[in-house]
């Protein structure tokens, strides 16, 4: 699931039907569980991506430092001698490293978005309660 798909789903799920406020209040727990599950899945993807990043960083450090297996240099030659102080420049500008950093940032952004959704679901109950109270007031019950 992408962030855009998640946003569309949230927009649909958080709509409140003014005519069935009683059912909407019960729906909160289901929604909270649903988005908590999404958050857990994205957090697991984030942990995996961070682990992949560490492995890739080590591989790139060996590659640019001249310590990688000879087979790697046959398939992907690198003829420069890089100083230890310059290793980070080469590693941080490597396309694979940048792609993985973008993936990590995307997952972190998605998790922050889901945290906001979870807060909205919690406040949704309060909003529904206020709407019910307002309807009672309008009907002269309060």
Describe the function of each predicted region:
Residues 1-142:
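Charge-rich amphipathic alpha-helical interaction elements
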